[in-house]
Curated annotation (Swiss-Prot):
Matches recorded under InterPro entries: Aldolase_TIM, OMPdecase, OMPdecase_AS, OMPdecase_bac, OMPdeCOase_dom, RibuloseP-bd_barrel
Protein name, UniProt field: Orotidine 5'-phosphate decarboxylase
Organism of origin: Anaeromyxobacter sp. (strain K)
GO molecular function: orotidine-5'-phosphate decarboxylase activity
Assembly and binders: Homodimer.
SMART domains: OMPdecase
Active-site residues annotated for this sequence: K63 (proton donor)
Disulfide bonds: none
GO biological process annotation, one example: 'de novo' pyrimidine nucleobase biosynthetic process
Amino acid sequence: MKPSERICAALDFPTFAAAEPFARAVAPEVGLLKVGLELFAAEGPAAVRAAARLGRPVFLDLKLHDIPNTVEGAARSAAASGAALLTVHAAGGAEMVKAAVRGAGPGVRVLAVTVLTSLDAAALDAVGLAGPPEAAVVRLARLAVGAGAGGIVCSPHEVAAVRAAVGPGPLLVVPGVRPAGAAKGDQARVATPAEAVRAGADVIVVGRPLRDAPDPAAAARAIAAGL
């Protein structure tokens, strides 16, 4: 995998019209484009189709978490939109993950989100998950891969432990990535792009450091050069 192919640019914009100049600028420099909740809530499957027309696979980051039947139907609809990857919450349980895989079909890789990168140990304890984040992440990763998930989403702090737990097959996608010197924002468990890849990340998700850069394409090239 070329360094640039490891970068997923997040289209964190309220509309595709707002996202399009950025998406067109970075698409030649990255491997994937991510449509998240904000953009999907505004424009639905049309946002996925528009992003896909730029020639990169689309990562639809909806973090589905509901009863298995509902998630299966939602995954089927996501597949019809043209998404190549789709996220669900591993905490929804093995049956929900299995349902997502059934609904998505063979053309879409289902990724299971473990613990959000905005949560630290204190935040996890407050919702009843005592102990270090790594323990919860590894437990959820094993559950999801056992249920058929094709990949795991985890922070750079846990990616090495997840790789050791699930083996070489699943795709490991890592948000919470910030170039050296960049602001953490609302992320609690972060690392630089190079640190994440060295730890075992296959794909790094980069949002604000690209979106807010004066020259997003140049920023993407700089990240790729450091991998």
